[in-house]
């Protein structure tokens, strides 16, 4: 348990090439990671996981997804071997009841919208990382309510996502 509550961070990842680069963005991400209290887990809401429904990754070892094309081979070799946490996934699902979220044990993982930033914020990749999908068919109000239901987790889970 951390000593002070964590708030959500809204971080646009920009180019996946930021994973390999040192620039003003990646330096700020590293500084953020050094300044944050250590969370129990990280939950990222990723626009790259855009489905008809809401799901949270619930595997112990989420795969790293290279969901892009046209970049150098070195980027496709990038890895962020963070663990997952089915237990934290269940806590998230419980917070979103009734009926908001399903557990995803094997169809997704950690996409570049998450790992390209976390490679700098938490470079050791030793914190459980979970992703929450974006419900492509739900109205704006649904997503606001989702955020309200996630709010009580702020003292246990760092959350990240971006909305433009």
Model region roles, listed by residue range:
Residues 1-3, 35-36, 121-125, 152-155:
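Solvent-exposed alpha-helices and their adjacent loops that cap or buttress functional pockets
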Residues 89-144, 149:
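Internal, conserved structured core segments that host functional sites
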Residues 143-164:
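A contiguous pocket-lining binding segment that forms or flanks enzyme active sites
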Residues 39, 101-102, 156-159:
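A general structural signal for well-ordered secondary-structure junctions
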Residues 2-100:
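A short aromatic-anchored loop/beta-hairpin motif
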Residues 9, 41-43, 128-130, 159-161:
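Conserved beta-strand elements of the Class I
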Residues 46-48, 108, 162-164:
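Short, well-ordered beta-to-alpha junction loops that form the rim of enzyme active sites
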